[in-house]
């Protein structure tokens, strides 16, 4: 199991009191989020990237007995658009790594006024990973496109009906990578995700799976002022049931995570 420094603070927000109650009683839930990879939004830049892999595509199609210049324009466009740009829905749990003294206002207004500060050990136990951010048409996003396009090209095959198809196993491997990568230029956030099985190629999909969460796993609980007493009572009951000697502190949603209580 990986080690995540215990000094790091991880925030998970939700918009409703009932959702927080469910998390405290039944664990945190994996929900579907769309993940997407496109190296650039600019058509001309995308064309340059496609041109770099066309020789490999042409060689692969020729080897399959389907030369590129014999395909109709509709099929060519489908092949080119599917080479290195992908999207899909993946079950996951999202958390934000919060540096000391960082304002929580954006998180509260964007994601909800009920929140948990979860200990690093819990994230490590459940396989959480920090998201890698790459810039639009940056060297990293270009290389990711090249890798994905190459895998897609090498996985091309001809169906019994003569159609050219992408390989599901190759596609699944790439889709499983996408939850850990985001293409964007805004780099102020540090997001972590616990990613569940999507079941694209067989197997059970883990949407709505709950990850056990004990009082010992939580450092703070943030709620609106009028909910502090209610959740303090809930936490004390759960802590007693679980034998937790130091239950998490319930606070009115602060402007930043307290350094200590």
Stretch-by-stretch model annotation:
Residues 1-261:
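NAD-dependent ADP-ribosyltransferases
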């Amino acid at each position: 199991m990986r080690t995540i420094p215990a000094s790091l603070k991880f925030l998970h927000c939700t918009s409703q009191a009932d959702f927080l109650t469910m998390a405290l009683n039944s664990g945190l839930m994996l929900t579907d989020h769309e993940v997407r990879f496109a190296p650039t939004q600019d058509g001309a830049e995308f064309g340059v990237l496609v041109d770099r892999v066309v020789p490999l595509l042409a060689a692969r199609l020729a080897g399959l007995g389907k030369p590129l210049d014999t395909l109709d324009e509709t099929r060519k466009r489908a092949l080119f658009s599917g080479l290195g740009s992908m999207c899909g829905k993946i079950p996951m749990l999202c958390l934000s790594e919060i540096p000391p003294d960082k304002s929580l206002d954006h998180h509260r207004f964007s994601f909800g006024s009920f929140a948990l500060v979860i200990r690093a050990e819990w994230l490590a136990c459940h396989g959480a990973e920090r998201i890698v951010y790459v810039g639009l048409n940056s060297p990293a996003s270009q290389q990711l496109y090249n890798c994905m396009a190459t895998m897609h090209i090498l996985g091309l095959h001809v169906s019994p009906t003569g159609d050219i198809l992408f390989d599901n196993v190759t596609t699944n491997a790439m889709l499983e990578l996408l939850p850990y990568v985001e293409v964007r230029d805004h780099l102020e956030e540090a997001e972590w995700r616990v990613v569940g099985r999507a079941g694209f190629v067989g197997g059970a999909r883990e949407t709505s799976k709950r990850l056990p969460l004990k009082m010992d796993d939580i450092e703070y609980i943030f709620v609106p002022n009028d909910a502090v007493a209610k959740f303090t009572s809930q936490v004390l009951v759960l802590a007693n049931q679980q034998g937790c000697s130091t239950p998490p502190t319930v606070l009115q949603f602060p402007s930043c995570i307290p350094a200590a209580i």
